[in-house]
Amino acid sequence: MIKLFDPFVGKKEEKILIQTLRGHLWASGAGTNAVYDFEQKFKKYVNSKECVAVNSGTAALNLALSVIDLKNKEVIVPSLTFISTVNAIKLNQGIPVFCEVEPDTGCISVENIKKKISKKTCAVLPVHFGGLSCDLKQISEICKNHKLSLIEDAAHAAGASFNGKKIGRHGDFVCFSFHPVKNLAMPTGGLISINNSDYKKLKKELYAKRWCGITDRKGISYDVKELGNNYYMNEFSAVIGLKQLEKLDGMNKKRKKIAKIYDQEINLEAKIPFENDCSYHLYWILVKNRSRFIKKMMREKIEVGVHYKPVHQMSLYKNNQVKLPVTETIGERIVSIPIHPNLTNSNIEKIIKSVNEFAE
């Protein structure tokens, strides 16, 4: 079976895992040792003001939104995303306002953002879909003009760039996800990159909230001033993350090489565009008869996936009664095909041949 996702790991990850296991310091709510090192190195990598490591991309979104007053306020967000993006708004008592995406990229539509802004809007939450960056220049201008917070969902975008700057350098908060299926793989992990002018204060607040609200820690003494969660990253994830970060650009270069071949040789117009700045977490195509296509691909032992069923069509959010024709069409037809660095030349050839034969 050619896997849809497959982490690119080697002896360096194996060696550091054994060292960490034998070191007996596996986790610390205070975020010391490898967790702190990972924060510092990722901060340097994206050139942000600060970084706070957490235990998942979902935790990153929940935590970032918790330091913004969202109660009964609106957050503009695409529906073409993983459920966590929107749930984080709802969990923080905000109101998700679903926005249309661009048909050729799957990224949030700038023109539709403008139409969705109301007196209740307090933030915009774009998703760098598949690793292709949204138009952060225009979105940042909109947020600045309307005094809105910009929180980016960069779960797919580790290593991606926009206008020569790494994703992680632009928004007030940029939320990353690190998981075995992601470009930077960990058992589980996440991170918030902070660029807001109050970054020092926000980092301190996020540090407390990721460890059950614990603050003012001095020796055995500490205080709790507000609610928090058990969101801190463990040492195993951090040490793997450090090794993965060293080779992230190289792994993404392999993804781009595969993407360029797909772009040239897959005979479909409806597919993710080729962009040098894209991290290609996903390579998506649109097919007319998805269920039949998936069955045929699986018969050829090629694993494929669907990213995603639009969130506004989920039972939890159906009361919004919003119509998003572009999102809904993509949601009915989208299929992700393998694009990870472990693919061999023969794997790539087989995938292209099968897609061209089975897609309509």
Task: State where each predicted segment sits.
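N-terminal "arm"/small-domain region of PLP-dependent enzymes with the aminotransferase-like
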Residues: 1-27, 338
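Short secondary-structure boundary/capping segments
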Residues: 6-8, 88, 165-167, 182-183, ...
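Hydrophobic "lid"/C-terminal helical patch
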Residues: 21, 64, 351, 355
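Phosphate-binding glycine-rich loop
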Residues: 28-74, 80, 88-92, 98-100, ...
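PLP-dependent aminotransferase class I/II
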Residues: 36-40, 45-51, 58, 111, ...
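PLP-dependent aminotransferase-like
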Residues: 67-145, 149-154, 161
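Conserved active-site segment immediately N-terminal to the catalytic lysine
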Residues: 152-186, 220-224
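Short beta-strand-to-turn element immediately C-terminal to the catalytic PLP-Schiff-base lysine
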Residues: 176-177, 190-196, 242
